[in-house]
């Protein structure tokens, strides 16, 4: 054991020594590490709590560094050549043992200057590879490179398991003018927990998680984790090659929306591993084409369901390691399923360890709460006018799509981004530079985002949750649109659910709620969403929205699903809806799988599977989703009987959907059809295989030359109550 070294006065003035030991010195590389002093090289080391420090040359020569003050060591090192950064190592004696390491302050700048300049100009291309924690080898020394954008900070240090969370030990170098602080720490590897200690422009010292961390602790812990950067062994080459064709507007897209934490409880098994073993095969067996996950990004509060994330580059640790999430995506692709993630660039929570006032200023958010705080969620709003913030968000999106092979992003709360007065009364919002309510900076950001995804991630899609009539959400950026591939049809969802909640005796007065959606069905490329938002906050379940006794509720839900699957637009159904979950969704409990012991609920699940199969295999139900020629009303005005009939067509096929939204049978109901000949029943929601009473029409019907509804041919049948029929023309 080495003895404590005698103290010396040293070559640093008292003020500098005090600033170092107090954790206030902003430029550690100017005083720590090797420095030329005349013909000699002086080495200084800041190691509070160390008993002794020695500089060890490659040949084994040892030079004790002498303490100027407890924790601050210095000495001339004979034989050390200036400008040879890796030419010595440190041997540090701590109370608990000996540490051998290279000196972090012996290395020059580690970030590429050209890439830094690109990021400083608002470029996102190199951002995820520059900032955060990355494995690196510098001058033959392995370790981790840390970097943080904090341009207004007075000082930044990286703290963690490797330095006892002592902010004095590893202060970082500022790369001006990019505003990025960097430090290479030798011998720090995957699994190490860390944060950044930031002395802000406001004079306050705070601990911040890494905004670009690719791995994080599970809440309530808040540290970032140095990730394991070994590449994942993907097996989805075939899927990735076919992805673009599977996600086009003329392809069948049926999305199963899932909250990873409550789909199934597998007795404490790691969530992604458990889901990978069960969920892809389940969704595939029901005919879904995609799984959409509520946000999987690291978030501090589970009750937010992920919609208040702080780790925009890290999968939530509660479900497993990043590699486990990659495995889940790979298994989905193996099962022929795409993966869409909900992604939240609209706002972020103000937790102390997060982005809020990261460098002592409103860096990621607006300074004025009329712009920077969201009145609905009490969260902070990104400053889209700042190029570095736009780059941060776009880099996050590209990271999920490229690093994790994700197939699409559903962008949350787009309406709140587009309007400066969203949820704000008069006098509580700031107009744009033209005096209007449009958020011009957010518009530019969304266009830039979608353009970047299109170039960098061919075949990937973006979907907007946009609840207003903003024009051109899915129009190309070049044509003045926002550039999304699809938009949730919130209007269709609200209108039709409002209709279905009504007592059937009153539905005749609200027939337009079912038909109005076709007025604007081709204004955008739409997804019809029955999402998690419709089964929370006292809204009850989808089944619970249907009036009447349980048998009537199930019959109406079957009818509603058949109407939806025949209607133009891609499909989305939240988990539990496929078998008629009775209770409102609870994120703290798994789905009511026991309901599948009931034949009626199994029948509903079977119907969803059959609807998906028919939708995917009959081209007229999907290939002209974005083309008005693919739809024609047959019976759109029979409000008295609450009956709708319409045709879905392509160049060679025709399917007619007939829906009776009352419990009253309609015997001898006649409606026109576009073609003469035989029409086969492809779906009958009242069939016994779906839990219905049966008694529907025969499997094949022949048209009669009796004009009806503008067609020279017609069909006549007994239309049961609460029933939808799909009739396909036989060639």
Curated annotation (Swiss-Prot):
Keywords: Carbohydrate metabolism, Glycogen biosynthesis, Glycogen metabolism, Glycosyltransferase, Transferase. Its EC number is 2.4.1.18. This is 1,4-alpha-glucan branching enzyme GlgB. One of its GO terms (biological process) is glycogen biosynthetic process. Monomer. It comes from Bordetella parapertussis (strain 12822 / ATCC BAA-587 / NCTC 13253). It holds the Pfam family Alpha-amylase. The active site is at residues 412, 465. Belongs to the glycosyl hydrolase 13 family. GlgB subfamily. One of its GO terms (cellular component) is cytosol. The keyword Mitochondrion does not apply. It catalyses: Transfers a segment of a (1->4)-alpha-D-glucan chain to a primary hydroxy group in a similar glucan chain. It comes from the Bacteria. One of its GO terms (molecular function) is hydrolase activity, hydrolyzing O-glycosyl compounds. Pathway: Glycan biosynthesis; glycogen biosynthesis. InterPro entries: A-amylase/branching_C (IPR006048), Branching_enzy (IPR037439), GlgB (IPR006407), GlgB_N (IPR054169), GlgB_N_E_set_prok (IPR044143), Glyco_hydro_13_cat_dom (IPR006047), Glyco_hydro_13_N (IPR004193), Glyco_hydro_b (IPR013780). CDD domains: AmyAc_Glg_BE (cd11322), E_set_GBE_prok_N (cd02855).
């Amino acid at each position: 054991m080495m003895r404590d070294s005698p103290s010396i006065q040293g070559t640093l003035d008292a003020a500098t020594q005090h600033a170092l030991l107090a954790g206030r010195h902003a430029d550690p590389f100017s005083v720590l590490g090797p420095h030329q002093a005349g013909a000699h090289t002086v080495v200084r080391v800041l190691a509070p709590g160390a008993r002794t420090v020695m500089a060890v040359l490659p040949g084994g020569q040892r030079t004790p560094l002498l303490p100027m003050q407890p924790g601050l060591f210095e000495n001339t090192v004979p034989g050390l050549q200036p400008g040879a950064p890796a030419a010595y190592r440190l041997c540090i004696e701590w109370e608990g043992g000996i540490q051998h390491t290279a000196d972090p302050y012996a290395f020059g700048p580690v970030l590429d200057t050209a890439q830094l300049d690109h990021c400083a100009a608002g470029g996102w291309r190199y951002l995820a590879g520059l900032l955060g924690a990355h494995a690196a080898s510098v001058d033959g020394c392995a370790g981790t490179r840390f970097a943080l954008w904090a341009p207004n900070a007075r000082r930044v240090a990286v703290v963690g398991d490797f330095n006892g969370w002592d902010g004095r030990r590893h202060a970082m170098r500022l790369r001006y003018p990019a505003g990025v602080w960097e430090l290479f720490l030798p011998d720090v590897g995957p699994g190490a927990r860390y944060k950044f200690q930031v002395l802000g422009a406001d004079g306050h010292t705070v601990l911040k998680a890494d905004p670009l961390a690719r791995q994080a602790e599970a809440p309530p812990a808040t540290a970032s984790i140095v990730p394991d950067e070994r590449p994942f062994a993907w097996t989805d080459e075939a899927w990735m090659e076919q992805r673009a064709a599977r996600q086009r507007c003329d392809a069948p897209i049926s999305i199963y929306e899932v909250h990873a934490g409550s789909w199934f409880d597998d007795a404490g098994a790691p969530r992604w591993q458990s889901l990978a073993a069960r969920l892809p095969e389940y969704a595939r067996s029901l005919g879904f084409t995609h799984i959409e996950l509520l946000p999987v990004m690291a978030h501090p509060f589970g009750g937010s369901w992920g919609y208040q994330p702080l780790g925009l580059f890290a999968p939530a640790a509660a479900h497993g390691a990043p590699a486990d999430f990659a495995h889940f995506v790979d298994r989905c692709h193996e099962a022929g399923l795409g993966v869409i993630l909900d992604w939240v660039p609209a706002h972020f929570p103000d937790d102390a360890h997060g982005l809020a006032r990261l460098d002592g200023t409103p860096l990621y958010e607006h300074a004025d709460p009329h712009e920077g705080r969201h009145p609905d969620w009490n969260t902070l709003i990104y400053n889209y006018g700042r190029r570095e913030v736009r780059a941060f968000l776009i880099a996050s999106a590209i990271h999920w799509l490229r690093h994790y092979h994700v197939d699409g992003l559903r962008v949350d709360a787009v309406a709140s981004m587009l309007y400066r007065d969203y949820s704000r009364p008069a006098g509580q919002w700031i107009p744009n530079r033209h005096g209007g309510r449009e958020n011009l900076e957010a518009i530019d950001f969304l266009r830039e985002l979608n353009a970047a995804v299109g170039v960098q991630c061919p075949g990937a899609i973006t979907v907007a949750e946009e609840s207003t009539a903003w024009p051109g959400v899915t129009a190309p950026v070049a044509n003045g649109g926002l550039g999304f591939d699809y938009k949730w049809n919130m209007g269709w969802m609200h209108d039709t659910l409002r209709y279905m909640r009504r007592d059937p005796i009153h539905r005749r007065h609200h027939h337009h709620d079912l038909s109005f959606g076709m007025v604007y069905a081709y204004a955008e490329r739409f997804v019809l969403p029955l999402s998690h938002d419709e089964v929370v906050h006292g809204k009850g379940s989808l089944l619970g929205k249907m009036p009447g006794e349980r048998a009537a509720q199930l019959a109406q839900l079957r009818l509603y699903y058949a109407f939806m699957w025949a209607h133009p637009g891609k499909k989305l159904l939240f988990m539990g809806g496929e078998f008629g979950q009775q209770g409102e969704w609870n994120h703290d409990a798994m789905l009511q799988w026991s309901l599948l012991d009931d034949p009626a609920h199994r029948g509903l699940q079977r119907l969803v599977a059959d609807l998906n199969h028919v939708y995917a295999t009959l081209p007229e139900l999907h290939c002209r989703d974005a083309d008005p020629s693919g739809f024609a009303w047959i019976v759109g005005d029979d409000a008295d009987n609450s009956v709708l009939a319409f045709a879905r067509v392509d160049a060679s096929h025709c399917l007619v959907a007939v829906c009776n939204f009352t419990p009253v049978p309609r015997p001898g109901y006649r409606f026109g059809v576009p073609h003469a000949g035989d029409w086969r029943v492809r779906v009958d929601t009242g069939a016994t295989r779906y839990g219905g009473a049966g008694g529907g029409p025969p499997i094949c019907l022949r048209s009669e030359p009796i004009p009806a509804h503008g067609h020279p041919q017609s069909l006549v049948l007994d239309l049961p109550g609460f029933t939808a029929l799909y009739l396909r023309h036989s060639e």
